[in-house]
A protein has these predicted regions:
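Polar/acidic, low-complexity leader/linker segments enriched in S/T/G and N/D
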Residues: 1-62
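Short, solvent-exposed polar/charged micro-motifs at secondary-structure junctions
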Residues: 46-47, 78-80, 131-134
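Glycine-centered structural positions embedded in regular secondary structure
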Residues: 7, 18-20, 35, 78-81, ...
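Residue microenvironments linked to proteolytic maturation
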Residues: 2, 32-34, 84-162
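A glycine-rich, hydrophobic loop/mini-helix early in the fold
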Residues: 59-94
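Short, charged/polar surface micro-motifs in flexible loops or helix N-caps
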Residues: 42, 74-76, 99-102
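Intrinsic disorder/low-complexity signal
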Residues: 3, 7-12, 43, 47, ...
Length: 162
């Protein structure tokens, strides 16, 4: 008599314990959002000003899909994906989807639908900057993430549900 290790299930062509493999994968629902993660020439509450074109090199190198969508800048809380990031005449326009694949994602979806979460904030490394009085002008940045936040450092950086 063969004994199975505890907690493990037999896998066959029919799936796990006879269930079809397709039942192991579920479709996730998403909530489409868009807005401005950064605005050209506007000082944030920390005295940073992003110059027009500051994200161009980073986005050309990585694309929007490599920039993470986080909740409140928490690296462990990836809550969705960014589908588009475009530098336009106003700033960095972003469009993406908050996914329901985690508790944080579902929470962010609910808050966004209710209008309680609508801020955006960028996580980056400055590649080139200059000082203008008390302000730091970011000329080129390496964009790592755009977070959905309660209180953005740039008060005008907001998103809405599509």
């Amino acid at each position: 008599m063969r004994s199975e290790p505890r907690g493990e299930q037999e896998v066959s062509e029919g799936g796990v314990s006879g269930a079809p493999l397709s039942s192991l994968f579920t479709r996730h629902s998403s909530l489409a959002i868009h807005g401005y993660a950064s605005l050209w020439g506007v000082a944030d509450l920390n005295g940073d000003v992003v110059a027009r074109g500051a994200f161009a090199a980073s986005l050309a190198k990585t694309g929007a899909g490599s920039v993470r969508m986080l909740h409140q800048h928490e690296g462990r809380a990836v809550i969705g994906v960014w589908d588009r990031m475009i530098e336009d005449e106003r700033g960095l326009f972003v469009a993406g989807r908050i996914m329901d694949w985690s508790a944080e994602g579902r929470f962010a979806q609910a808050l966004s639908r209710a209008g309680a979460l609508d801020g955006l904030s960028i996580g980056f490394r400055s590649s080139r900057a200059r000082r203008e009085g008390r302000l730091r002008v970011l000329v080129e940045v390496e964009l790592w993430e755009v977070s959905l936040v309660t209180f953005p450092m740039l008060p005008g950086a907001r998103f809405g549900v599509v």
